[in-house]
Amino acid sequence: MLFYRFKSWYRLQAKKSPFIYVGLPFLSSVLLVWSCLIPISQVKFNRRDEQVKSLSRDAELDIIKRRRKVDVNEEYYRILLDQLNLQNEEYENKRVKRLKGEPTWEGNSSDKE
């Protein structure tokens, strides 16, 4: 019963001053979550920076040597070919009976068959 009283009181107050009872709690919750997530995401970036800094000079040279040349046209056609291959794997030809009176390529009518 107490909950319903509070609910009706809150709804009435929210109609009178919506920013204080709706906007302010929303904005404060957004700011609270934002302030909590910044340190968490910063830890992730710090770890990544440490990994990059710890990469030795030999490993850097090895990565540079193994890098392949990238051509935009070649990549476009490679991706296009991959997509076509995926579509063709799912494709299956099925023969469908013709409707009566439907013409064929030879010019014969299927009525005669």
Swiss-Prot record:
Transit peptide, start-end: 1-12
Location (main, coarse): mitochondrion
Its job: Required for the assembly of the mitochondrial respiratory chain complex IV (CIV), also known as cytochrome c oxidase. May participate in merging the COX1 and COX2 assembly lines.
Keyword tags: Membrane, Mitochondrion, Mitochondrion inner membrane, Transit peptide, Transmembrane, Transmembrane helix
Pfam families referenced in this protein's UniProt entry, alphabetically: COX16
Positions of transmembrane segments: 20-40
Topology within the bilayer: Single-pass membrane protein
GO molecular function: copper chaperone activity
GO cellular component: mitochondrial inner membrane; mitochondrion
Location(s), subcellular: Mitochondrion inner membrane
Recorded family membership: Belongs to the COX16 family.
Protein name per Swiss-Prot or TrEMBL: Cytochrome c oxidase assembly protein cox16, mitochondrial
BP terms from Gene Ontology: mitochondrial cytochrome c oxidase assembly
Keyword Secreted part of the UniProt annotation: no
InterPro entries, sorted: Cyt_c_Oxase_assmbl_COX16
Keyword Membrane: yes
